[in-house]
Curated annotation (Swiss-Prot):
Any one Gene Ontology molecular-function term assigned to this protein's record: tRNA binding
Organism from which the protein derives: Pectobacterium atrosepticum (strain SCRI 1043 / ATCC BAA-672) (Erwinia carotovora subsp. atroseptica)
Protein name in UniProt: Small ribosomal subunit protein uS7
HAMAP family named among the record's database cross-references: Ribosomal_uS7_B
Gene this protein is translated from: rpsG
Annotated family: Belongs to the universal ribosomal protein uS7 family.
SUBUNIT field: Part of the 30S ribosomal subunit. Contacts proteins S9 and S11.
Gene Ontology CC annotation, any one: small ribosomal subunit
Disulfide bonds: none
Keywords: Ribonucleoprotein, Ribosomal protein, RNA-binding, rRNA-binding, tRNA-binding
Signal peptide residues on this chain, from the entry's feature table: none
Protein purpose: One of the primary rRNA binding proteins, it binds directly to 16S rRNA where it nucleates assembly of the head domain of the 30S subunit. Is located at the subunit interface close to the decoding center, probably blocks exit of the E-site tRNA.
A biological process from GO: translation
């Protein structure tokens, strides 16, 4: 590990349609094999569908869905004296967003709807209503952290 200066995080360019860095990150997470224009088309179609269903703005509806999936605590494995403990730790804000987006995309890919845009729209609308696979994933992570609260003093 070099002892020189700490390198800052790269700036991500905001997406062309809404000017949101969060949405640009979401497009990048959804993208497969470098096909960004395809990923953008899927996201924009899904947001259009979501906005029509919810009656809110595109970004506002997306934000609500993302908020309901963001985890606040997670567990990390820590080895102490020959046994491994699942230690609950708070999730940093950047990682919260990354995990939430990853879980939404993962859940959308597993759905059985016709197109990816429709699957994504359905998953986002479920997330906005606090239901769906991505929200369940967050609840499972929180439940795991709650169950292992006794090991919180092993934090590092």
């Amino acid at each position: 590990m070099p002892r020189r200066r700490v390198i800052g995080q790269r700036k991500i360019l905001p997406d062309p349609k809404f000017g949101s860095e969060l949405l640009a990150k979401f497009v990048n997470i959804l993208m497969v094999d470098g096909k960004k224009s395809t990923a953008e088309a899927i996201v924009y179609t899904a947001l259009e569908t979501l906005a029509q269903r919810s009656g809110k703005g595109h970004l506002e509806a997306f934000e609500v869905a993302l908020d309901n999936v963001r985890p606040t605590v997670e567990v990390k494995s820590r080895r102490v004296g020959g046994s491994t403990y699942q230690v609950p730790v708070e999730v940093r804000p950047v990682r919260r967003n990354a995990l939430a987006m990853r879980w939404i995309v993962e859940a959308a890919r597993k759905r059985g709807d016709k197109s990816m845009a429709l699957r994504l729209a359905n998953e986002l609308s479920d997330a906005a209503e606090n239901k769906g696979t991505a929200v369940k994933k967050r609840e499972d992570v929180h439940r795991m952290a709650e169950a292992n609260k006794a090991f919180a003093h092993y934090r590092w």
